[in-house]
Regions:
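Catalytic core of membrane glycerolipid acyltransferases/transacylases, capturing the structured
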Residues: 1-50
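Non-catalytic C-terminal accessory region of glycerolipid acyltransferases
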Residues: 14, 54-169
Length: 169
């Protein structure tokens, strides 16, 4: 999924039963809250070491998808990205795609219009999450990455161009 704000980290898990999330390890250091991701079988990663991060992502994804048969949520840009900011998609999603041989469902959204990256104040409006057609297994990494990024970015731009505002916005 696109990752523009904290909104989708709260909403997307609510939409799926027993979803696991790939998240930065630093979130597990938050007092009290930090004990929940490991207890819920999430995949915390050390973003300081690409090699260690990739190893834990692949091991965790295989466990979640093939052994536990749970959905996995990953933000392929690796971090929150402000509306209008360009950030490269990380190769980790393609490696997961190859390793687990499962369809990937891209998710476009416009949450950054109303709850910006690192913003305290929120704006009124209707956040839209759009689940796009699955990308079936079998593509090589380059073709998969191109299809994923094109799908998410194209649809997200359309959602950003036509925001649905509430009456009080």
């Amino acid at each position: 999924a696109k990752h523009q704000s904290a909104y989708e980290t709260l909403k997307l898990p609510y939409l799926f039963e027993d979803v696991a999330i790939v998240l930065k390890r630093e979130l597990t250091w938050i007092p009290l809250w930090g004990m929940y991701p490991p207890a819920m079988g999430m995949i915390p990663i050390d973003r300081g070491s690409a090699k260690v991060a990739m190893k834990s992502i692949l091991k965790g994804a295989e466990r979640i998808l093939n052994e536990e048969h749970r959905p996995l949520l990953i933000f392929p840009q690796g971090t929150r990205t402000a509306v209008g900011e360009q950030r490269k998609y990380k190769i980790g999603i393609a490696r997961i795609y190859e390793k687990v041989n499962r369809p990937v469902v891209p998710v476009a959204l416009n949450s950054g219009l109303y709850w910006g990256k690192n913003k305290f104040w929120k704006r009124s409006g209707c956040v839209t999450l759009k689940f796009l057609p699955p990308i079936q297994p079998g593509l090589d990494q380059k073709a998969f990455m191109e299809r994923l990024e094109t799908a998410i970015e194209t649809e997200s731009q359309m959602l950003l161009a036509k925001p649905e505002l509430t009456e009080d916005a």
